[in-house]
């Protein structure tokens, strides 16, 4: 799955939350958005998932504009993201958390996938 963000902007009234973001996430990559509080990470992810309507700009997933409801529903069934609001158990390691959530969501070949991620 390839995600392409073109000229993405989001305004809340007169406040500019996201300004002219452009990037591509290629199939098979694992990507994170990093930055200080309030810089627009969560807003950007919300727009990528079609949960927040951009003020301008476009999100394409596999060359399909997610503004189209049918495209968005089909595409988002195949996407995953880890919310910044999920509270992970503090006593578990990263690997243990991946196992817990992988089992919860029925991930196939879980141990192999975790091993690859932990390299």
Residue ranges and their predicted role:
Residues 15-16, 73:
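Short coil-to-beta microelement around the adenine-binding A-loop and adjacent beta1/P-loop entry
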Residues 36-40:
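Walker A (P-loop) phosphate-binding loop of ABC-type ATPase nucleotide-binding domains
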Residues 25, 57-68, 74-75:
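Conserved ABC transporter NBD signature motif
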Residues 49:
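Helix-to-loop junction immediately C-terminal to a conserved catalytic motif
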């Amino acid at each position: 799955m390839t995600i392409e963000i073109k000229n993405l902007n989001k305004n809340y009234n007169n406040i500019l939350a996201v300004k002219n973001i452009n990037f591509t996430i290629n199939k098979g990559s694992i990507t994170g958005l990093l930055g200080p509080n309030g810089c627009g990470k969560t807003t950007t992810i919300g727009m990528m998932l079609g949960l927040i309507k951009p003020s301008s700009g476009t999100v394409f997933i596999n060359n399909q504009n997610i503004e189209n409801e049918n495209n968005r529903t089909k595409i988002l069934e195949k996407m995953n993201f880890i919310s910044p609001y999920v509270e992970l158990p503090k006593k578990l390691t990263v690997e243990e958390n991946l196992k817990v959530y992988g089992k919860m969501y029925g991930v196939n070949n879980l141990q192999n996938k975790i091993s690859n991620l932990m390299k």
